[in-house]
């Protein structure tokens, strides 16, 4: 059994760790609220934009999307991996990294590059895959305009023929305890299918519907990427809050066990001292 000093040191160490994890949990909870409000606020806009694009595209020829919908033989693939800049968030980053590697295996025999958004994904994936860029600084100022610049970079690479397919992998936010890894095709735009009835109202379009669609598609792509990053940002704080909550509970349990061990050891030491005193007294009498 460890001596009393060692046990006291361990209790102090665990208590300090517990204070840190508890503080991190509270910070993540506050950040989660803001991130959750942001993703909730933008979803109606994203859904309405998609609905409008669906209604317009359903009444046009299949090639109305121009370069954005052009299907090419898949030889070069770019996978956008959205992770976080910090750790201590459970399997949040690991799940995305695992899915990126699965996609690389799926496209075996083809050129597969990674476009990292987040330091954690970049640090791991750059060891085994070709990472062409890392835009982790976007989290320092997470605005639509900053994300739009990244979306434009990706779009330019596709239109220029550098890649035949671009996919985005991220954690979709459900709630604080649940994040679901999503793989979405970014470009080319997948054929638009909807079970909803197409609005066929008598509208006058200015300019033409074709021009409106070609204007909406870039906006839709920027919104899609912004939504993915916002989802990931909220998921990160939810995952970290959950992880720190579990860590705090585990630290509390370990501290209580150490206190029990300490009390038992202290009681045993006192008992031994009493026995030694009694034994010494008996020896003097004898």
UniProtKB/Swiss-Prot annotation:
InterPro entries: ATP_synth_F1_ATPase_gsu (IPR035968), ATP_synth_F1_gsu (IPR000131), ATP_synth_F1_gsu_CS (IPR023632)
Coarse class of the protein's main subcellular location: membrane
GO cellular component: plasma membrane; proton-transporting ATP synthase complex
Entry membrane topology: Peripheral membrane protein
PROSITE patterns on file: ATPASE_GAMMA
Location in the cell: Cell inner membrane
Pfam family, one: ATP-synt
GO molecular function: ATP binding; proton-transporting ATP synthase activity, rotational mechanism
Keywords: ATP synthesis, Cell inner membrane, Cell membrane, CF(1), Hydrogen ion transport, Ion transport, Membrane, Transport
SUPFAM superfamilies given in the database record: ATP synthase (F1-ATPase), gamma subunit (SSF52943)
HAMAP family (UniProt xref): ATP_synth_gamma_bact (MF_00815)
Subunit structure: F-type ATPases have 2 components, CF(1) - the catalytic core - and CF(0) - the membrane proton channel. CF(1) has five subunits: alpha(3), beta(3), gamma(1), delta(1), epsilon(1). CF(0) has three main subunits: a, b and c.
Role summary: Produces ATP from ADP in the presence of a proton gradient across the membrane. The gamma chain is believed to be important in regulating ATPase activity and the flow of protons through the CF(0) complex.
Family label: Belongs to the ATPase gamma chain family.
NCBIfam families assigned: ATPsyn_F1gamma (TIGR01146)
Name of the protein this chain belongs to: ATP synthase gamma chain
Organism from which the protein derives: Flavobacterium psychrophilum (strain ATCC 49511 / DSM 21280 / CIP 103535 / JIP02/86)
């Amino acid at each position: 059994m460890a001596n009393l000093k060692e046990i006291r040191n361990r209790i102090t160490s665990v208590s300090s760790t517990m204070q840190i994890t508890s503080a991190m949990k509270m910070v993540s909870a506050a950040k989660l609220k803001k991130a959750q409000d942001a993703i909730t606020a933008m979803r109606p806009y994203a859904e309405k934009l998609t609905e409008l694009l669906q209604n317009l595209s359903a009444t046009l020829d299949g090639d109305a999307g121009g370069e954005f919908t052009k299907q090419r033989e898949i030889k070069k693939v770019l996978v956008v991996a959205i992770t976080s800049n910090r750790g201590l968030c459970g399997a949040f980053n690991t799940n995305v990294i695992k899915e990126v590697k699965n996609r690389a295996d799926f496209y075996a025999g083809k050129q597969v590059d990674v476009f990292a958004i987040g330091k954690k994904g970049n640090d791991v994936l750059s060891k085994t895959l070709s990472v062409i860029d890392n835009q982790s600084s976007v989290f320092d100022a997470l605005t639509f305009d900053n994300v739009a610049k990244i979306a434009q970079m990706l779009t330019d690479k596709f239109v220029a023929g550098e890649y035949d397919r671009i996919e985005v992998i991220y954690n979709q936010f459900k709630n604080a305890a649940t994040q679901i890894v999503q793989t979405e095709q970014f470009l080319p735009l997948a054929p638009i299918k909807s079970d909803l009835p197409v609005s066929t109202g008598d509208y006058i379009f200015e300019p033409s519907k074709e021009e409106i669609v070609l204007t909406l598609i870039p906006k839709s792509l920027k919104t899609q990427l912004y939504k993915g990053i916002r989802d990931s940002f909220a998921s990160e704080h939810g995952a970290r809050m959950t992880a720190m909550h579990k860590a705090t509970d585990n630290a509390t349990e370990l501290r209580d066990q150490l206190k029990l061990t300490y009390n038992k050891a202290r009681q045993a030491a006192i008992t031994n001292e009493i026995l030694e005193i009694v034994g010494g007294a008996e020896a003097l009498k004898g």
